[in-house]
């Protein structure tokens, strides 16, 4: 389940396609049958009836295809699926959890190099779902992880959110630049995050740095 923001960040989608192919995983893409959004943006905007219809549609799709594992790249979708969908019999994983499983099972062959990375904990994934270690283990399987000054539960917010209407675009950009500055201070060659919203915001704040 790519979700709205992953569809707007196609490099994530392409990367997941390569990972699925490399691992030999049999995959069904919910997005190709209209399962594009988890329903949270509609719910937060007060469109509760429309949100419920979307959620019911997604559940019907999942049951129709008899899926046993649901993988998403969006921490918001992850939290909504786990807490609001009541998907009995379906395991819901963030892509970092799924990738780590593939690595541990020997289904994804990687070579560790000298490339340096720094990791930004997304609010929804870290503080929201308590997922901190799995993304780091995936990074350390391919290179060297350099932690920023504020990390894990103390990580800075990137400034973007599907519900963030309380601050202006200029304020969002200022927050994104603060995050990018702290991450860049690690000296890492590549900035990594595990949320499509954070990726977009960090790239904007980093002004040309690879994210």
Which residues does each predicted region cover?
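Iron-sulfur cluster-binding electron-transfer modules in prokaryotic oxidoreductases
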Residues: 1-211
């Amino acid at each position: 389940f790519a979700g709205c923001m992953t569809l707007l960040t196609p490099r994530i989608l392409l990367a997941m396609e390569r990972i699925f192919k490399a691992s030999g995983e049999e995959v069904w893409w919910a997005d190709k049958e209209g399962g594009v959004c988890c329903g949270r943006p509609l719910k937060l905007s007060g469109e509760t009836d429309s949100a419920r219809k979307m959620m019911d549609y997604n559940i019907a799709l999942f049951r129709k295809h008899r899926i046993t594992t649901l993988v998403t790249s969006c921490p918001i979708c992850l939290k909504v699926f786990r807490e609001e969908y009541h998907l009995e019999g379906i395991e819901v994983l963030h892509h970092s959890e799924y990738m780590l499983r593939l690595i541990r099972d020997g289904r994804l062959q990687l070579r560790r190099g000298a490339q340096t990375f720094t990791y930004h904990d997304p609010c929804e994934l870290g503080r929201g779902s308590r997922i901190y270690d799995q993304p780091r283990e995936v990074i350390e399987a391919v290179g060297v992880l350099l932690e920023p000054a504020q990390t894990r539960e103390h990580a800075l917010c990137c400034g973007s959110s599907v519900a963030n209407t309380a601050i202006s675009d200029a304020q969002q950009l200022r927050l994104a630049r603060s995050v990018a500055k702290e991450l860049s201070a690690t000296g890492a060659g590549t900035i990594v995050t595990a949320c499509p919203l954070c990726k977009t915001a960090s790239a904007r704040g980093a002004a040309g740095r690879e994210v």
